[in-house]
């Protein structure tokens, strides 16, 4: 499925301002000010300068929290977003109840204690985010994430993303697959499944094991259209039911 740009000139703007460039600017800015986020339940609150809030928005990290404070802007980050900034980009620190967590392992263990499936979801999130795909929550579409080629203000999301492990019950039967594919197709998205291979149930799911030893397998699943295989169509067309393939574009 080709990118669906939201307005004329959006593609040119995206090419002129790649996400990777904005992320580099954000990384430098947050590191220089030694920005620190505060753990709050299953989110992280980050206080930043107005210019940094604009950079975070350009890079699609977090959501602005409305506040009467004018000097600082408050950004709410998901665990995946916060840990990506903390561990992968090394541009923010994380604190808990006023105490700065000394290393990434402490932060990792806290997030895993709040959300046991965090290792699997972070591995999937960092896999796509490291390839400069923009990820947002896919809750309203019945999936884990939606993936954008660039900022959501410029382009519609191309993929609805489901994260699975080897023992997951999702998409185990054909009816589940067809429902997921039809739902994604109805909102002009391709269903992308990310199979994260590893044992997530053991107590030894530590930081290094997850990030270095676990692997991610990408597959796209699309719906077969019977009208494309009628007798009056070219015999060179090849259709499959359903069409499952590796995501070569990522």
Curated annotation (Swiss-Prot):
What Enzyme Commission number(s) apply to this enzyme? Answer: 4.6.1.16
Classification via SUPFAM superfamilies: tRNA-intron endonuclease catalytic domain-like
Q: What is the protein's major site of localization?
A: nucleus
Places the protein is found: Nucleus
Q: Where is this region: Disordered?
A: 225-250
- Keyword field: Lyase, mRNA processing, Nucleus, tRNA processing
Gene3D superfamilies, alphabetized: 3.40.1350.10
At the top of the EC hierarchy, this enzyme's class is lyase
Which reaction equations make up its catalytic activity?
A: pretRNA = a 3'-half-tRNA molecule with a 5'-OH end + a 5'-half-tRNA molecule with a 2',3'-cyclic phosphate end + an intron with a 2',3'-cyclic phosphate and a 5'-hydroxyl terminus
Q: Name one GO molecular function term.
A: nucleic acid binding
Comp. bias regions, Polar residues: 234-250
In the record, biological process GO terms are: mRNA processing; tRNA splicing, via endonucleolytic cleavage and ligation
A cellular component term, taken from the record's GO annotations: nucleus
Question: Where's the active site on this chain?
Answer: 148, 156, 189
Question: Which family, according to the similarity comment?
Answer: Belongs to the tRNA-intron endonuclease family.
Assembly? tRNA splicing endonuclease is a heterotetramer composed of SEN2, SEN15, SEN34/LENG5 and SEN54.
Q: What does this protein do?
A: Constitutes one of the two catalytic subunit of the tRNA-splicing endonuclease complex, a complex responsible for identification and cleavage of the splice sites in pre-tRNA. It cleaves pre-tRNA at the 5'- and 3'-splice sites to release the intron. The products are an intron and two tRNA half-molecules bearing 2',3'-cyclic phosphate and 5'-OH termini. There are no conserved sequences at the splice sites, but the intron is invariably located at the same site in the gene, placing the splice sites an invariant distance from the constant structural features of the tRNA body.
Q: What is this protein called?
A: tRNA-splicing endonuclease subunit Sen2-2
What species is this protein from? Arabidopsis thaliana (Mouse-ear cress)
């Amino acid at each position: 499925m080709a990118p669906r740009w939201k307005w004329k000139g959006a593609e040119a703007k995206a090419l002129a301002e790649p996400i990777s460039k904005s992320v580099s600017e954000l990384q430098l800015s947050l590191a220089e000010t030694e920005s620190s986020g505060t753990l709050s339940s299953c989110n992280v609150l980050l206080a930043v300068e107005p210019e940094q809030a604009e950079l975070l928005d350009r890079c699609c990290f977090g959501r602005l929290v409305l506040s009467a404070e004018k000097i600082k802007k408050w950004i709410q980050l998901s665990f995946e977003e916060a840990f990506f900034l903390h561990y992968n980009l090394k541009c923010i620190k994380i604190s808990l109840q006023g105490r700065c967590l000394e290393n990434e392992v402490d932060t990792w263990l806290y997030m895993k204690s709040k959300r046991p499936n965090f290792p699997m979801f972070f591995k999937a999130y960092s896999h796509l985010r490291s390839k400069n795909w923009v990820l947002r929550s896919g809750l309203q579409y019945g999936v884990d994430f939606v993936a954008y080629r660039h900022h959501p203000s410029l382009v519609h999301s191309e993929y609805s993303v489901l994260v699975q492990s080897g023992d997951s019950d999702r998409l185990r039967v054909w009816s589940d697959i067809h429902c997921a594919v039809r739902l994604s197709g109805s909102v002009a998205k391709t269903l992308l499944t990310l199979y994260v291979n590893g044992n997530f149930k053991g107590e030894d799911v530590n930081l290094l094991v997850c990030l270095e030893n676990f692997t991610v397998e990408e597959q796209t699943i699309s719906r077969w259209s019977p009208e494309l295989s009628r007798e009056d169509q070219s015999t060179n067309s090849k259709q499959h039911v359903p069409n499952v393939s590796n995501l070569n574009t990522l």
